[in-house]
């Protein structure tokens, strides 16, 4: 896709799929000119430069394909189970391959659900934008 479209950038974080949240490790793939432009300004938006330790850990994570596949499969299984449970509770959502579910309940306002969940120390995101007002990011 990056060869077909010069304005497409594919980014990957190691936070969830490689269990390295907080390490600030990831990469971007895209048109060489787009990557160069990002490199030219990277210190203005990236306040977490990669250390030698971060690079070594990132390389080790990439080389451990078995762990990555097991973690990825567990994330997918958990997401699909959660979608089934949410659907049974009256939620609707689009098909997504992300690590979150953007859901709307058929009869209960999202803000009400958000407040009730927060009271139980369950944290989801609620949005107030016009087109996504009644959705939760779970």
Where are these regions (language model features)?
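Short, conserved loop/helix-junction motifs that constitute active-site signature segments
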Residues: 1-5
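Short acidic capping loops at alpha-helix termini that bridge into adjacent secondary structure
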Residues: 6-7, 134
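PLP-dependent aminotransferase class I/II
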Residues: 7-86, 91-94
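Short, acidic/turn-prone active-site loops that include or flank metal/cofactor-
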Residues: 15, 128-130
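Short acidic/glycine-enriched loop/turn segments that link adjacent beta-strands
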Residues: 22, 97, 131-134
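Residue-level "edge-of-site" marker
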Residues: 51, 99, 130
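Conserved PLP-binding catalytic core of the aspartate aminotransferase-like
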Residues: 75-76, 80, 85-120, 136
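Active-site catalytic microenvironments in core metabolic enzymes, especially phosphate/sugar-handling
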Residues: 125
């Amino acid at each position: 896709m990056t060869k077909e479209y010069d304005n497409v950038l594919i980014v990957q974080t190691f936070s969830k799929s490689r269990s390295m949240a907080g390490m600030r490790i990831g990469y971007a793939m895209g048109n060489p000119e787009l990557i160069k432009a990002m490199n030219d300004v990277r210190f203005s938006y990236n306040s977490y430069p990669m250390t030698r330790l971060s690079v070594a850990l990132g390389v080790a994570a990439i080389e451990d394909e078995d762990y990555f596949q097991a973690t990825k499969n567990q994330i997918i299984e958990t997401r699909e189970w959660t979608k089934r449970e949410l659907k049974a509770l009256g939620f609707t959502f689009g098909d997504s391959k992300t690590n979150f579910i953007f859901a709307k309940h058929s009869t209960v306002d999202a803000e009400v659900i958000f407040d009730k969940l927060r009271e139980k120390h369950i944290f989801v995101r609620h949005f107030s934008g016009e087109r996504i007002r009644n959705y939760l990011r779970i």
